[in-house]
């Protein structure tokens, strides 16, 4: 699938292992993984950060193979679901950073253009999440209140 605002094709991706079974050397079982996710989620970590920690520290390649559920689903069942989805959160964070940069550098025309592109992606993603009922139907991105969302 191609990039939205760039000429690149974006074809490289990570390869998942063919076997979907848990490796024999893994010492954690499904309950231990769930407890680790709960503990890390209470610290305020995002699902991708939790996955990185589980991969690097505990040797869990895919939580779904061990537990049968993805990290976000486990967090939802425990009640630690983030208010806004992670990808939307990071895009809002990027827009806030660009806006802060533009306050100091008013003549940065390319920065202004990139802000428009990022905000259009935010609106598109928000529309998708509203149709999937992840965000409430009255949720709206406003640049004036965006810094409070990512604070």
Curated annotation (Swiss-Prot):
Q: Quote the InterPro entries the UniProt record gives.
A: Ribosomal_uS15 (IPR000589), Ribosomal_uS15_arc_euk (IPR023029), Ribosomal_uS15_N (IPR012606), uS15_NS1_RNA-bd_sf (IPR009068)
Gene3D superfamilies listed in its UniProt record: 4.10.860.130, S15/NS1, RNA-binding
Example of a GO MF term: small ribosomal subunit rRNA binding
Q: Which GO terms describe its cellular component?
A: cytoplasm; cytosolic ribosome; cytosolic small ribosomal subunit; nucleolus; small-subunit processome
What Pfam families does the entry give?
Ribosomal_S13_N, Ribosomal_S15
Provide the leader sequence positions: none
The GO biological-process annotations, alphabetized, read as: cytoplasmic translation; ribosomal small subunit biogenesis
Domain of life, per lineage = Eukaryota
Database matches in SMART domains: Ribosomal_S13_N, Ribosomal_S15
Tell me yes or no: is Transmembrane among this UniProt entry's keywords.
no
Q: What is its main location?
A: cytoplasm
Subcellular location as annotated: Cytoplasm; Nucleus, Nucleolus
Question: What keywords would UniProt list here?
Answer: Cytoplasm, Nucleus, Ribonucleoprotein, Ribosomal protein
The record's family statement is: Belongs to the universal ribosomal protein uS15 family.
Q: Could you tell me what this protein does?
A: Component of the small ribosomal subunit. The ribosome is a large ribonucleoprotein complex responsible for the synthesis of proteins in the cell. Part of the small subunit (SSU) processome, first precursor of the small eukaryotic ribosomal subunit. During the assembly of the SSU processome in the nucleolus, many ribosome biogenesis factors, an RNA chaperone and ribosomal proteins associate with the nascent pre-rRNA and work in concert to generate RNA folding, modifications, rearrangements and cleavage as well as targeted degradation of pre-ribosomal RNA by the RNA exosome.
Q: Which HAMAP family match?
A: Ribosomal_uS15_A
Describe the protein's quaternary organization and the partners it interacts with.
Component of the small ribosomal subunit. Part of the small subunit (SSU) processome, composed of more than 70 proteins and the RNA chaperone small nucleolar RNA (snoRNA) U3.
Q: Could you tell me what this protein is called?
A: Small ribosomal subunit protein uS15
Which source organism? Drosophila melanogaster
Its taxonomic path starts at: Eukaryota, Metazoa, Ecdysozoa, Arthropoda, Hexapoda
């Amino acid at each position: 699938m191609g990039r939205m605002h760039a000429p690149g094709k974006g074809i490289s991706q990570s390869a998942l292992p063919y076997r979907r079974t848990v490796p024999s050397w893994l010492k954690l079982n499904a309950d231990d993984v769930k407890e680790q996710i709960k503990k890390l989620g209470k610290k305020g970590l995002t699902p991708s950060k939790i996955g990185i920690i589980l991969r690097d520290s505990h040797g869990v390649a895919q939580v779904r193979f061990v537990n049968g559920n993805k990290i976000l689903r486990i967090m939802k069942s425990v009640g630690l679901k983030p208010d806004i989805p992670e990808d939307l959160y990071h895009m809002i964070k990027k827009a806030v950073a660009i806006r802060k940069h533009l306050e100091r550098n008013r003549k940065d025309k390319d920065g202004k253009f990139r802000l428009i592109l990022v905000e259009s992606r935010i609106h598109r993603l928000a529309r998708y999440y509203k149709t999937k009922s992840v965000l409430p139907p009255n949720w709206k991105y406003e640049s004036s209140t965006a810094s409070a969302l990512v604070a």
